[in-house]
Amino acid sequence: MKRILPLILALVAGMAQADSNSDYRAGSDFAHQIKGQGSSSIQGFKPQESIPGYNANPDETKYYGGVTAGGDGGLKNDGTTEWATGETGKTITESFMNKPKDILSPDAPFIQTGRDVVNRADSIVGNTGQQCSAQEISRSEYTNYTCERDLQVEQYCTRTARMELQGSTTWETRTLEYEMSQLPAREVNGQYVVSITSPVTGEIVDAHYSWSRTYLQKSVPMTITVLGTPLSWNAKYSADASFTPVQKTLTAGVAFTSSHPVRVGNTKFKRHTAMKLRLVVRVKKASYTPYVVWSESCPFSKELGKLTKTECTEAGGNRTLVKDGQSYSMYQSCWAYRDTYVTQSADKGTCQTYTDNPACTLVSHQCAFYSEEGACLHEYATYSCESKTSGKVMVCGGDVFCLDGECDKAQSGKSNDFAEAVSQLAALAAAGKDVAALNGVDVRAFTGQAKFCKKAAAGYSNCCKDSGWGQDIGLAKCSSDEKALAKAKSNKLTVSVGEFCSKKVLGVCLEKKRSYCQFDSKLAQIVQQQGRNGQLRISFGSAKHPDCRGITVDELQKIQFNRLDFTNFYEDLMNNQKIPDSGVLTQKVKEQIADQLKQAGQ
């Protein structure tokens, strides 16, 4: 028996060296030739037209539990029973038990070749050899992942200051007296004109004039015009009287006039004739103090946001108001401000994994929906993540031999053909299951449900958060449905539809809600978002009224499944696959070899 064991090992090594590389290359070439044929040929295939005697519901359908079934149901039990009791099983068992034993001769040529391979193993597959060299090769592969996240939204309030006056007003009388002959006069168009600048502003409540008789003995009549009022003057007579002026008011700094002719007959005046004018003016007396009034403009409820920045938009300094001819001035350090509020904080959402991975880079992003004010609230982001594959090869002359199972991946790249094919088949199977369950005229597949969450006026109570639920105390106010929706979002079962104001008072929004379409599986979410919306451009409705209807059969046939990205489904697929443990396989091979050696020694 000890002599036979090296022979068996030599046999295995010889066969592995001689055939592994050629068989592997042949299989790899064949796989690349038929790549993609399965998924393209299955689309639009009608089995009843191509398969004679096709039956859509054979008896064997009782063993099929759907793509989500955990096992094969009764198929295993029925198979075991048939093997033990059926004629076919009995025949196979008897043939196996009565089969003559194979006696291996130590002198067989293939055993001798195997021994030779064992003796030269290090030079064949090791890192040594006269004409061979071991090399490391590596390859980078980039995979795109799409995720969703909230963006930070900033809104602004403005505060503007204006200067106003406060105080009281009283009235007093002022008496103004003038002697016209003592004032400078100018000759204008044959008239002597005296201009008098008023020192006050007010209403003339009494006007009085007077003059004395002159030295002239003859009568010299003329007209003196004062404040627009004509007065009759004569050199032979004196006068002392009141009059009602045409001009009723005086303005500080503004002149009024008195005038008469330069020559009357043969008499020529050298200046304005003597005349006293007395005016009693009612003047307003005010006592004012300047102060500042602030006005604010805010298109949203400040309770919905957090103040992050305040900046001055109109520089400070002195400003002046003039009232009743009097100037009032005051100083302000800033006359207008702009306050910045964050009304929505950024949330990494389902992008957390990729933003934390240094091998992932943001390649594109697109706004999913906007606020009523036009700000982007939510976006779809695409990250490209790099993964490196390395392997060890032996280069002998012009031939390259793979020393481990990774070198072909490093040379040609890892392929997701299997995962992609299984995902497409699973999507079609799931759609078929939905259709079969309805049996109606208006058949739909992958139907979802409209879900809502609220963003309360308290600011910190955001029940629409995509992450950080365990650390936010404000989330205690969220309902169980909102918490379930958050779980569905983390499992990538939702499609974001929009956001709207659900409670508004006096034009200010106090509460907002966000709407989603929630589906039962990742496959449904992928087909709905990428197929229905992405390819067919069918909307999910408005924020207030989401349209989460299923996909019709006609729409399903128009979707190109080979263009759908099933990356999110791959994770579940790979996590749920059952691959035998390598240690178990090794032990099983050892047991089989031991059994063969025992039989050979008998």
Swiss-Prot record:
The gene is traN. Essential for F plasmid conjugative transfer. May interact with the recipient cell surface to stabilize mating pairs initiated by F-pili. May interact with TraG. Transfer requires OmpA and lipopolysaccharide (LPS), which are possibly receptors for TraN. InterPro entries: TraN_Ftype (IPR014121). It comes from Escherichia coli (strain K12). One of its GO terms (cellular component) is cell outer membrane. Interacts with OmpA of recipient cells. Might form multimers. May interact with TraG. Keywords: Cell outer membrane, Conjugation, Disulfide bond, Membrane, Plasmid, Signal. The first 350 residues are required for recognition of OmpA. Has higher gel mobility under non-reducing conditions, suggesting it has disulfide bonds; a dsbA deletion mutant has considerably less TraN that is still localized in the outer membrane. This is Mating pair stabilization protein TraN. Changing C478S: 1.5% conjugation efficiency. It is found in: Cell outer membrane. Disruption phenotype: Greatly decreased conjugtive transfer. The lineage of its organism: Bacteria, Pseudomonadati, Pseudomonadota, Gammaproteobacteria, Enterobacterales. Changing C548S: 0.1% conjugation efficiency. Residues 1-18 form the signal peptide.
